[in-house]
Swiss-Prot record:
The gene is pstB. GO terms for molecular function: ATP binding; ATP hydrolysis activity; ATPase-coupled phosphate ion transmembrane transporter activity. This is Phosphate import ATP-binding protein PstB. Belongs to the ABC transporter superfamily. Phosphate importer (TC 3.A.1.7) family. Its EC number is 7.3.2.1.
C-alpha cells in the first residue's frame, strides 16, 4: 500500500504524489514512456533507491502493516521479503548451486545440508530451470544462456521465501523464446507471490498482468484492470500512449 509517495534526486522531483495499492497474488504491470518514473517507483518498494546518493523518498509504503521507510527498519530482511529481478541477468560469480543457496545460508533458512539442498531444488523447479541444470549444479551460473541466467536469478530470489517479487524489465535482454518462458513463469509464480513488473512492452503487460498502472512524467495517471486500461482507458494521456500517439 503506497500513499503520497514522492521521490527526489537532489532538486529533481522524479515521482510525484503516487498512491497505489497492490493486491496479494496479482501481477501488476507498470508501463509508460522512458523516463516516466516507473523503475524509480519500483525501486522504492524495497528501498533500492537508498543506494543512490542524493535520493530522498517521502510518503508511506506499507508492507504487512509496517511502513518500510520507518527509521529503525533493517533493509536486509526487507529485501528478502521484497525480492528484485533486474533488467540484465546478474548471477553471482559462483556455481549454479551456490547462486541459489547463498540467500538461504545468510538468512539462516536451512538447518542442515539436506534442507538447503531441498530449498535449492524447489527454487530451481519453481523457476522452471531444474531439469536443465540438475546435472550441472557445480558449473558457473555465468555459463548459462541469457534466459537461463534470468531464471536462475528468479530462483535465487524465491529461495529466500519473499512475499513480493519486483521485476524491472526482466525480458528486455532476452530473445523471444526465452521471453516466452519467463512470461509463463510469471503466470505460474503468481499463485505464490505478488509480482510488480516494469515493462516497455505493452503486449507483455497485456499478457502477464491482471492490473496495469500507467506513469507519465513522474505521475501515476491511471491504474485499473489490464483489459480495461488497454481497451477503454479513462485518461487521454493513457489513450495517447496505448495508441502510439506518443511514447
Amino acid at each position: 500500500m503506497c500513499r503520497d509517495v514522492n521521490v527526489y534526486y537532489g532538486e529533481k522531483h522524479a515521482i510525484q504524489n503516487v498512491s497505489l495499492d497492490v493486491g496479494h497474488n496479482e501481477v501488476i504491470a507498470l508501463i509508460g514512456p522512458s523516463g516516466c518514473g516507473k523503475s524509480t517507483f519500483l525501486r522504492c518498494l524495497n528501498r533500492m533507491n537508498d543506494t543512490i546518493v542524493g535520493c530522498r523518498v517521502t510518503g508511506s509504503i506499507r508492507l504487512d502493516g509496517q511502513d518500510i521507510y520507518d527509521g529503525g527498519l533493517d533493509v536486509v530482511p526487507l529485501r528478502a521479503q521484497v525480492g528484485m529481478v533486474f533488467q540484465k541477468p546478474n548471477p553471482f560469480p559462483k556455481s549454479i548451486y551456490e547462486n541459489v543457496a547463498y540467500g538461504p545460508k545468510i538468512h539462516g533458512l536451512a538447518n542442515s545440508k539436506a534442507e538447503l539442498e531441498e530449498i535449492v531444488e524447489s527454487s530451481l523447479r519453481r523457476a522452471g530451470l531444474w531439469d536443465e541444470v540438475k546435472d550441472d549444479l557445480a558449473k558457473p551460473g555465468t555459463s548459462l544462456s541469457g534466459g537461463q541466467q534470468q531464471r536462475l536469478c528468479i530462483a535465487r530470489t524465491i529461495a529466500v521465501s519473499p512475499e513480493v517479487i519486483l521485476m524491472d524489465e526482466p525480458c528486455s535482454a532476452l530473445d523471444p523464446i526465452a521471453t516466452a518462458k519467463i512470461e509463463q513463469l510469471i503466470d505460474e509464480l503468481r499463485e505464490l507471490y505478488t509480482i510488480a513488473i516494469v515493462t516497455h512492452s505493452m503486449q507483455q503487460a497485456a499478457r502477464v498482468s491482471q492490473r496495469t498502472a500507467y506513469f507519465h512524467l513522474g505521475r501515476l495517471i491511471e491504474v485499473g484492470d489490464t483489459a480495461q486500461v488497454f481497451t477503454n482507458p479513462r485518461h487521454p494521456l493513457t489513450e495517447d500512449y496505448i495508441t502510439g500517439r506518443f511514447g
